[in-house]
Amino acid sequence: ILAKKMMGAGGGSIINISSIAGLQAAPMQAIYSVTKAGLIMLTKAMARECGRKGVRVNCICPGVIKTQLSEALWKDADREKAFAAQKALGRIGDVEELVGAAIYFASDASSFTTGAVLTVDGGMVI
């Protein structure tokens, strides 16, 4: 519905938030991973369908970010250390670190970007 309104209004930017789980399989997360992979493919399909009407559709795929949802992974110092060790940057991300990606996709700086999937994961999926 939103995409149709944006196409009728001359364009815009849709930013989907998926997860690195949609790019890389993880134990005991089949359903979560399938839904996130589906959102990535929806992003690409919508980018193709909406692009000529001026609507850009892109996707941000965060890794483990310190939120209430992921609290069990970082609240305990030993678990946080184990998850941080899996990343090239050696730490878990903060919510504020997603802002730059969102601003880029929402702004004219990404006027020639559509169907893109940007990982913001500290180098976990390399």
Where are these regions (language model features)?
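Hydrophobic structural elements of the Rossmann-like NAD(P)H-binding subdomain
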Residues: 15, 57-60, 70, 115, ...
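Residue(s) in the substrate-gating loop at a strand-loop-helix junction
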Residues: 19
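Short, flexible catalytic-loop segment of classical short-chain dehydrogenase/reductase
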Residues: 40, 61-72
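Catalytic Tyr-x(3-8)-Lys segment
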Residues: 77-97
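Alpha-helical segment proximal to the catalytic Tyr-Lys
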Residues: 4, 48-52, 111
